[in-house]
Amino acid sequence: MTSLLLFGASEGGLFDFDATLPLMAVQVVLLTFILNALFFKPVGRVVEEREDYVTSSLADAKKKLAEVEKLESDLKNQLKEARLAAQSVINEAETDSENLYREALALATAEANASREEARREIDSQRESALNQLRSDAEKLGDLIVERLLASK
């Protein structure tokens, strides 16, 4: 019995060179073709589609980023121009208001000077009139005093 066991042990080792080895090789090759046709090609196609999608999305994102940066710089330039225009309008308004202030001040000063000059002329006229009246009264009083002195003698 032992000899039968030893005799049977020589078969069925690691590699048996009988019909199973080529059959296994054919099965592996056939399985490779089937997996390639049914699994690897569709998966590869999906991976390529996703890679194309990611690439196109990345390119679109770069274009949109460039467009956004361009729009941002345009808006910054427009804002800068608007600020400069607003500052120009403010400066012009300040200049106009300063000119109006100076004109109003000059007009008020001229009116005040005219009123003062008119008042001075009126005062001079009244003073001259009062002096003339005073001279006239002094003359009359002097004549009256002379008459009374002459009459009392």
Swiss-Prot record:
Listed transmembrane segments: 20-40
Instruction: Give its localization.
Output: Cellular thylakoid membrane
Tell me a Gene Ontology molecular-function term this record carries: proton-transporting ATP synthase activity, rotational mechanism
Q: Which UniProt keywords apply?
A: ATP synthesis, CF(0), Hydrogen ion transport, Ion transport, Membrane, Thylakoid, Transmembrane, Transmembrane helix, Transport
Give membrane topology per the record: Single-pass membrane protein
Q: Which GO terms describe its cellular component?
A: plasma membrane-derived thylakoid membrane; proton-transporting ATP synthase complex
Family assignment from sequence similarity: Belongs to the ATPase B chain family.
The annotated subunit structure for this chain is: F-type ATPases have 2 components, F(1) - the catalytic core - and F(0) - the membrane proton channel. F(1) has five subunits: alpha(3), beta(3), gamma(1), delta(1), epsilon(1). F(0) has four main subunits: a(1), b(1), b'(1) and c(10-14). The alpha and beta chains form an alternating ring which encloses part of the gamma chain. F(1) is attached to F(0) by a central stalk formed by the gamma and epsilon chains, while a peripheral stalk is formed by the delta, b and b' chains.
What exactly does this protein do?
F(1)F(0) ATP synthase produces ATP from ADP in the presence of a proton or sodium gradient. F-type ATPases consist of two structural domains, F(1) containing the extramembraneous catalytic core and F(0) containing the membrane proton channel, linked together by a central stalk and a peripheral stalk. During catalysis, ATP synthesis in the catalytic domain of F(1) is coupled via a rotary mechanism of the central stalk subunits to proton translocation. Component of the F(0) channel, it forms part of the peripheral stalk, linking F(1) to F(0). The b'-subunit is a diverged and duplicated form of b found in plants and photosynthetic bacteria.
Task: List the protein's name.
Answer: ATP synthase subunit b'
Q: Which organism is it from?
A: Prochlorococcus marinus (strain MIT 9211)
Gene behind the chain: atpF2
